[in-house]
Amino acid sequence: MKFIIAPAKKMIRAQDDFPVQSQPKFRVQAGELLLLMQQLTFSEAQALWHTSDKLTQTAYNQLQQSDLTRQQSPAIFSYSGIQYQYMAPDLLDDAGLVYIQQHLRILSGLYGILRPFDGVVPYRLEMQNHLPLPHHRNLYDFWGNRLYQALARMPGPIINLASDEYAKAIRPYLQAKDQFIDVRFAHRVNGQLKTRATYAKMARGEMIRFAASHRLTKAADLKNFDSPTYRFNAHLSTATQLVFIAK
């Protein structure tokens, strides 16, 4: 069983409490993308990121100084969005950390696909950003089936905890033999099911922590996820989607 999740826009340079254990599989390709980004003007970068002048200036300065080989920190501690805060990987025991290194993959616009302890540096590039590429239409085209192939080499079903933006980098390449299971966290609003993004991000992080803490190996075991907000709904779930409804 392997989980896929999205990265976070907000990144930090993590402290040295947890060392880098591995390098990104597609570090060469990430270097190519970084070089293209570093050639952008301030205005082009702002158009790419859709950011304010102040945020663009900070990110642009960081971009010009970026070096993928220096001042790395583990990916799992470098992303600091809501999902990662609720995952709380720093609170996992050693066996839990080994579990996420083996079973969790982070999809990334810049790096393609990451293991939790791959060394990364802060960057700003979402999969849906329209970075001008010389031989490709967009980042989905740039990465092609490489991210799927990396997942396909791992045993077991793919548990999709990623946003649609990042799951789109995998879905087109799925084969009949693949077991791809979406996880949905929803609220009942006026008789309809609605996803509330912030709560869903919290739950995704908590589910990863739950799986790591219990060393889960079967997708069916995720039905026992003890979320403070959501409960598994067997009636709405299918073989390809696990549905959790707000209590």
From Swiss-Prot:
Q: Which GO terms describe its cellular component?
A: cytosol
| Name of a matching Pfam family | H2O2_YaaD
Where does the record place a coiled coil? Answer: none
List this protein's GO terms for biological process: response to hydroperoxide
UniProt xrefs under InterPro entries = YaaA
Protein family according to the UniProt entry: Belongs to the UPF0246 family.
Q: Quote the protein name from its UniProt record.
A: UPF0246 protein LCABL_22600
Give the organism, scientific name. Answer: Lacticaseibacillus casei (strain BL23) (Lactobacillus casei)
